Amino acid sequence: MNPSLKRRGTMQENETKRVKKVCDYGEKCYRMNPVHFREFSHPHLESILDNHTSGGDYPIPDKYNLQKKLITEQLDVIIEKGFYAPRNNVQNNPKQIENKQETYRDRREGKNVEPEASSASHQKVPDKPENTKIMSLNNEAKIKTPIDRGGVVKEKSSYSDYRPIIPPTRRVEDYLNVVRPKGRMAAKHEASAPFYIFYTTITAAKETHSQPFSITFQEILDRSLGELKCSLQINFMVELGWLLAQYYFAGYSEKKLTILYGEDSQDLRTISQKKPHVDAHLVPMATPFGKHHTKMMILCYEDGSLRVVVSTANLYIDDWENRTQGLWFSPKCPELPSEAMPHDGESPTMFKKSLLRYLNHYHMPHLTYYVERVKRSDFSHINVFLVASAPGSHFDMDWGMTRVGSLLRQHCCIPPEEQLQWPLVAQASSLGSYGKDPKLWLTGDFLHNFTKIKNQSQMLSSPPTLKLIYPSLENVKQSHDDLLGGGCLPYAAEAHSKQPWLNSFLYQWRAASTNRNRAMPHIKSYTRVSKDGRKAAYYLLTSGNVSKAAWGSMNKGNGALRIMSYEAGVLFLPKFVTNEDYFSLEQNARNRLIVPYDLPPVKYTDGMSPWVSDYLM
């Protein structure tokens, strides 16, 4: 047997044996993301596959006629990825499976797969609206591209052209599980000052639905914040149907949208052909060990202002339902006067300069408009530092863990005599490979940079304690989604087997104080907490996990910091946010810093083991 086919067969066997929960949306599921079909079962789709015996059309029942196109594409994804083995002997033959997967890949890429198709079959048929799926909502919002009398498509309009709000014709409550009242986000955002930190609403935890610090994606697009003109979404995983549905329900289905993404997708590759106002670009990576892992938004408004969102959530439904995510939602940054210089409107934290440095690192002409908008905006009131990572070897202190260390060395106010009494609490959704000894990186360069302080002694001394919050197997079992709650925690058993010493650093996910105890964390955050648990020296909210790929590793030869991934986060320092030396963590404090987990952290008990993704195999 062909070795690659054997590996594929093994993978398919593992996928079909995977513990799957039935999708809550049932026959109304509109999802296209392969991750969703890997994690959830869809009986109505599997029934169709059970009755499918050839590479031709699927035997889709008449009752699904209105969503036939959507179901066909969903079935193609399931077969192509090997997520379901149909209950008939013909399709269980490995050679038949391989042939079918090639057929479905061809069909998804628009190739002709019908051997005896008539000439009529090659004619383009106008898309028909589909009644019951969110994917069909996008058809209602298609841009009608002008055509001149000679049949030539006219050039797309520029960013300066106004695109109207298009009120949705469907009820948002019929499609989204948690819907907050419209028109109230501006007041809610203002009340979140001076931190502007939000945690995503948990669908299964009703207590979170009305929390002042909880947020839904629809609230990010709420019109009380201003009328959107265009937006830039920078992310890793993007489920296009879900994202466009969010814009549709906000009335922004015709507004220009640019997407930078890290995980390849056929839908994203071809979206501009279907929707000329949506521009999507895959960010190439130099190494498979690096990821385009940043989660950021730049929202540009019709009045010339903009807002920046730095988040931990991918742009697909699972990340916005029962997972703990965090985001910083900036205040509005107004447009500078026309005579202003590009460097005007800078903040005390140099946020504008840092954001431009990050955007320019892509070297993408598609970002020119957003770079210019940032240059023309006033960031003078921004009180956080942008902390980003970008692939490459860096000799300055502008990126990764040396950026963190440099800022803390200037501004962290922990007294030197108390240095060992303030542990570093690092909370992540995945752990890296650190080697046989923690001193090689974890309690070496990483801990050294994340625990720097002002007036630090140059004398060598023991580092502060490191407490790593990462869910145990027991934590995941009690999650809202049972074992599937671990779908956002990709730490592997093989990696853990090589560093058993890590167990002594691990602490459980406990978040009863924010009603997120059963919502597994995809958030990543770092802080230093006083011995009595009443104060924090800083708070870093970021996409970066505790890994070398995210924060970098030092090249001992030339001193360069080697980073493999794109990441973005914001660092909150008390001096800039509250004009004090520390953040208060006390319940009734006036400017209380709300962290998503319980303090003090609870250590793993004897016999506990960290969650590993192999449990889903």
Question: Where are these predicted regions, by residue range?
Answer:
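Cys/His Zn-binding finger modules involved in RNA regulation
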Residues: 1-121
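PLD/PLD-like phosphodiesterase catalytic module centered on the HKD motif
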Residues: 2-10, 17, 95-98, 102-617
